């Protein structure tokens, strides 16, 4: 293959303002806690969020922990991932509040909360 026949592909990351995942694992297996590195006395529900731009995960974590009785399990400001834990109703309430603030106050595109 000659230099002239090679194609060059450039991939760009162009973030939008969106919540792409809002999920509740109501009764997680204990292995999930171990694999995530969550060290908690009580194995409650887990809430998962994925947000773009990733810096908004900081806002989501703040809203979630102030809105309800949940613990912050994980936040990654580089990937936009947030993991919270608590009883099912607290996790659901926290996720609803996060979606409300990001969607209505900050004009993010949002998703529905899913559950397993």
Swiss-Prot record:
A component of the bacterial microcompartment (BMC) shell dedicated to ethanolamine degradation. Expression of the eut operon may allow this bacteria to use ethanolamine as a carbon, nitrogen and energy source. Unlike its S.typhimurium homolog, does not make BMCs when expressed in E.coli. Targets at least 2 proteins (EutC and EutE) to the interior of the BMC. Proteins such as EutS containing circularly permuted BMC domains may play a key role in conferring heterogeneity and flexibility in this BMC. The keyword ATP-binding does not apply. Residues 8-108 form the BMC circularly permuted domain. The keyword ATP-binding does not apply. GO terms for biological process: ethanolamine catabolic process. Keywords: Bacterial microcompartment. Homohexamer; unlike its E.coli ortholog the hexamer is flat. Its pore of about 10 Angstroms in diameter is closed in the crystal structure. Interacts with the N-terminus of EutC and of EutE, targeting them to the interior of the BMC. SMART domains: BMC. This is Bacterial microcompartment shell protein EutS. Disulfide bonds: none annotated. GO terms for cellular component: bacterial microcompartment. It is found in: Bacterial microcompartment. Belongs to the EutS/PduU family. The gene is eutS.
């Amino acid at each position: 293959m000659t230099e002239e026949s090679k194609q060059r592909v450039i991939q760009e990351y162009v973030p939008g303002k969106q919540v792409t995942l809002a999920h509740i694992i109501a009764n997680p297996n204990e292995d999930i806690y171990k694999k995530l590195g969550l060290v908690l006395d009580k194995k409650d529900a887990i809430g998962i969020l994925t947000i773009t731009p990733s810096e908004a995960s900081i806002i989501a974590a703040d809203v979630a922990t102030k809105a309800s009785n949940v613990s912050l399990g994980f936040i990654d400001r580089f990937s936009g991932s947030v993991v919270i834990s608590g009883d099912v109703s607290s996790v659901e309430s926290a996720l609803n509040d996060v979606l409300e603030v990001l969607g209505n106050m900050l004009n993010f595109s949002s998703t529905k909360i899913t559950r397993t």
